């Protein structure tokens, strides 16, 4: 093999199960073009697969780490002792990374970070963050597949199956790669974001030497460690969603919830097989705003659901008045093949559905316009999406791409801006959907710490 290939030293300790782990790691290293070398001094980096079952094994593992540190200095630790990263870090604070047993991907990530694989122009055509169809500065981060709910209007479970959550460490590593590749905004998506981890009983995984549960709050805490906006989408209104709102108040993730309420009539919600405690929903929205005054609440609704009476539709309009939601999408009910709602009696005539949809959207447009108008005179941090001549198009923390509004920066020709850059914008005008304003000069902008947004 060519001497130009990167070289890895490897120490394998412990039981046969650990030996199999070592074999798998070595196989992956060789498949990526790394040379495996027998001595510390000829290695560019050393991997130590440890044992931690009994005290003598712990001592042997720590001694092996120490020997590798003394003779090489670039050491990645994995294996059973890696479940106690504080013990390793206390003895050897300068090890490059620590991961637990069977965590092959973390080992490979650490090797890649310390010693990138040799570039092969014939096969290495994909960046480590993958192929993306979004602009480079934002990306969707899918955390699960499928859904355990049986909403009567939906056929997603029959198409995509039951909830399958991705391991939290895998999600966090993907997010880390995306941010390293230039992503400034992570949009967390799934069929049911708030159910994340239910199917795996909130299994705990290690990332950056810290344990994280496969749970929405823990995921948000991990994502908040990255230098990017974090925006939550498709959040089913479980009570535990309330746990992430304090993180929004602390500016650790964006103060934004995309949470589909679907209706406000308890009877219609029961027919939809959705949560029906409307008064509690209103209380929760009010409480979110007390905790995080800048929170943006987006929701979606269905009008003209089978059996919906005029009185029940009026309940929905009253809910809009009370909730004062920032952004809303609405749809006239349309039968979907395979949905159980198709069998419900008292279908609403099409012309009535369309008339109710128009009334619904007219009321919400007034609410949204008033909430946007209240932002005139404020300074909003924005992410630049495009520059078109002397106008730049950006989004504030309140605006997800494609579905929400825009911030039109009207002095882009006077202030040096770049796509994917954060900029503070003084808002001067608004309309029913968008904001307009002027970017502040760089000297007038506060120093940006992307971890505190």
From Swiss-Prot:
Cofactor needs: [4Fe-4S] cluster
Catalytic activities: L-aspartate(89)-[ribosomal protein uS12]-hydrogen + (sulfur carrier)-SH + AH2 + 2 S-adenosyl-L-methionine = 3-methylsulfanyl-L-aspartate(89)-[ribosomal protein uS12]-hydrogen + (sulfur carrier)-H + 5'-deoxyadenosine + L-methionine + A + S-adenosyl-L-homocysteine + 2 H(+)
Binding annotation for [4Fe-4S] cluster 1: 15, 51, 80
Sequence ranges assigned to domain MTTase N-terminal in this UniProt record: 6-116
Signal sequence region: none
Residues annotated for [4Fe-4S] cluster 2 binding in this entry: 147, 151, 154
Pfam families noted in UniProt: Radical_SAM (PF04055), TRAM_2 (PF18693), UPF0004 (PF00919)
Cofactor detail note: Binds 2 [4Fe-4S] clusters. One cluster is coordinated with 3 cysteines and an exchangeable S-adenosyl-L-methionine.
SMART domains in UniProt: Elp3
One GO term (biological process): tRNA modification
Function: Catalyzes the methylthiolation of an aspartic acid residue of ribosomal protein uS12.
PANTHER family: RIBOSOMAL PROTEIN S12 METHYLTHIOTRANSFERASE RIMO, RIBOSOMAL PROTEIN US12 METHYLTHIOTRANSFERASE RIMO
Name this protein carries in UniProt: Ribosomal protein uS12 methylthiotransferase RimO
Organism: Stenotrophomonas maltophilia (strain R551-3)
């Amino acid at each position: 093999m060519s001497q130009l290939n990167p070289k890895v030293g490897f120490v394998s300790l412990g039981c046969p199960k650990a030996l199999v782990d070592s074999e798998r790691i070595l196989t992956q290293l060789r498949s990526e073009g790394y040379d495996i070398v027998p001595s510390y001094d000829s290695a560019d980096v050393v991997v130590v697969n440890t044992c931690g079952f009994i005290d003598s094994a712990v001592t042997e593992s720590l001694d092996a780490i120490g020997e590798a540190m003394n003779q090489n200095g670039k050491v990645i630790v994995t294996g059973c002792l890696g479940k106690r990263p504080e013990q390793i870090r206390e003895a050897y604070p300068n090890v490059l990374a620590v991961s637990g047993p069977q965590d092959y991907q973390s080992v490979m990530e650490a090797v890649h970070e310390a010693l990138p694989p040799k570039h092969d122009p014939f096969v290495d055509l994909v960046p480590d963050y993958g192929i993306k169809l979004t602009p480079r500065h934002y990306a969707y981060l899918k955390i699960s597949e499928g859904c355990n709910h049986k909403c009567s209007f939906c056929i997603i479970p029959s198409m995509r199956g039951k909830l399958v959550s991705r391991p939290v460490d895998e999600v966090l590593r993907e997010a880390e790669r995306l941010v390293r590749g230039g992503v400034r905004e992570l949009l967390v998506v799934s069929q049911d974001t708030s159910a994340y981890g239910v199917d795996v009983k909130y299994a705990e995984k290690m990332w950056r030497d810290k344990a994280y549960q496969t749970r929405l709050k823990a995921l948000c805490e991990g994502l908040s460690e990255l230098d990017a906006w974090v925006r939550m989408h498709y959040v089913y209104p479980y009570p535990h969603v309330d746990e992430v709102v304090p993180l929004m108040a602390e500016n650790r993730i964006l103060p934004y919830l995309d949470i589909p309420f679907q209706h406000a009539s308890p009877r219609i919600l029961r027919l939809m097989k959705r949560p029906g405690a409307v008064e509690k929903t209103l209380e929760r929205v009010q409480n979110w705003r007390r905790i995080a005054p800048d929170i943006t609440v987006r929701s979606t609704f269905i009008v003209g659901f089978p059996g919906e009476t005029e009185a029940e539709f009026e309940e929905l309009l009253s809910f809009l008045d009370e909730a004062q939601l920032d952004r809303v999408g609405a749809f006239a009910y349309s039968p979907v093949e395979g949905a159980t709602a198709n069998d419900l009696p008292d279908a609403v005539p099409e012309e009535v559905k369309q008339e109710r949809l128009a009334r619904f959207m007219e009321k919400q447009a007034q609410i949204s316009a008033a909430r946007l108008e209240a932002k005139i005179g404020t300074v909003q941090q924005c992410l630049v999406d495009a520059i078109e001549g002397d106008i730049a198009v950006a989004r504030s923390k309140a605006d997800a791409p494609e579905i929400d509004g825009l911030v039109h920066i009207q002095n882009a020709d006077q202030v040096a801006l770049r796509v994917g850059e954060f900029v503070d914008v003084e808002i001067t005008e608004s309309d029913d959907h968008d904001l307009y304003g002027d970017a502040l000069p760089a000297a007038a902008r506060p120093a940006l710490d992307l971890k505190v947004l």
